[in-house]
Amino acid sequence: MTKVRLVPWSEHDFQLLVRLNAPEMTQHLGGPETPESIQLRHKRYVAAAKSGTFSDDEKGYAAYIFKAILEPDGVAVGGVNFWDRDWNGETVYEMGWGVLPEYQGRGIASAAVGEAVELARATQRRSAIHAFPSLDNGPSNSICRKAGFELRGEVQFEYPKDHWMQCNDWVLRFAS
């Protein structure tokens, strides 16, 4: 069984974010971000990992940002995050993840998502967590299914800003 440990994002994780921004990693997300955007994202990740909050246009919202460490090797192999999102009149968590190409297909993303779901549940702040993989991202849609998410259907989704894509809306409701 694949063992993954989630560790809060740190200032030392910039190169991991650069690698997660590679074309093969962002093909389902509208392509790579600019170097400037990645630097800003890294700063937001570090700040959120320290404070538990993202700040956007003077509005703050909860965010949990982690790198995924493959055990027992202790190697950073990707990231998994969840954050507050208003969705269909409800404040829920949204989750996203990525695993470096050379580590894909080994159950690492599934293990990391499973760990993150348990962390999200433990916050007791939200009743559900959603994931929005693009329709053509078979592996991420499979991860949602394996993690116990329920497929709600197709939706138009903006990510990154000003880029609209067709996604599946997966939800996992936490028992109250």
PLM segments and residue spans:
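Charged, solvent-exposed alpha-helical segments that act as regulatory interaction surfaces
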Residues: 30, 51-55, 73
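Amphipathic alpha-helical interface surfaces
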Residues: 38-41, 78
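Sparse recognition of residues in long alpha-helices and their boundaries
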Residues: 33-34, 54, 90, 160
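Acyl-donor (CoA/ACP) binding surface of acyl/acetyltransferases
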Residues: 1-28, 65-176
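An alpha-helix initiation/capping motif
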Residues: 35-39, 138
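A short helix-loop-beta-strand connector motif used in the catalytic cores of GNAT acetyltransferases and
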Residues: 46-67
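Helix-loop element at the rim of GNAT/NAT acetyltransferase active sites that forms part
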Residues: 19-36, 44-50
